[in-house]
């Protein structure tokens, strides 16, 4: 004899299954020193994407680059609007299915697709060039940052010799990580470090913190006289701008909607995209070739660590 379930039980089961299966989009945001401001800057993205995709969007605030990397690898992050090239490379080398390029963030000012790692000192300090920092305290930003560690570390190894573990053959008195770009900037301002690295486009109005980068972000967060209190004494070769990425193995239909919505956001609510991306940036087409140099450098670094 067949067992007949009450209709209400069947309906309840179907409802529970549908609720459980409801898709959501997780927007990865690197909070850093001003996580509240970063979350606020992405509220317009959340609203726009929810309207376009009909899907709930969660803002996932990450304390550091590693959290974004692990979020993608662990299916907890689906979208990053302006990802560190090194972090992108780290995910790509670990599992290519977890990261898919949508575009490269490109400067509105001159359409450049690159930025620089720079070394900052206080404007009233005697330091005018990298060589003047011998015996001083220096800070990188984050070990998973391109401009905050990968590129300047590689350049210092070539220029100064040694590595971070031996303070580049004893050139610096002390070398460490602050935890992020904003922390580096504030650490220089308050005298915690003699010098530190951050990232900037190096184009546009200097007094505004240039067109994009951490300097501009800090200035916009209330440090009106920031640029008059800092001096740049070194800059790296051009680094490819951060990519906009989605998680590669998310539901294909939802991914297609999400990619279309992000491109529409850039075109139809560009001020929102600018606020969330961290500067006067827009999206252009890209491919793996633009990031191959960074990928190769990360791969070489990983082999050295092993």
Language-model features: where?
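Gram-negative bacterial Sec-dependent N-terminal signal peptides
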Residues: 1-20
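Pocket-lining segment of extracytoplasmic ligand-binding domains
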Residues: 143-251
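Bilobed "Venus flytrap"/periplasmic-binding protein-like clamshell domains
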Residues: 26-51, 85, 109-186, 271, ...
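An extracytoplasmic/periplasmic, membrane-proximal ligand-sensing/linker region
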Residues: 22-29, 33-44, 214-217, 246-306
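Alpha-to-beta junction loops
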Residues: 73-81, 96-98, 137-138, 189-202
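Extracytoplasmic small-molecule ligand-binding "clamshell" domains
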Residues: 22-89
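Extracytoplasmic/secreted proteins, especially bacterial periplasmic and envelope-associated proteins
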Residues: 40, 44, 48, 67, ...
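A structural signal for short loop-to-beta-strand junctions that line the ligand-binding cleft
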Residues: 98-112, 229-235
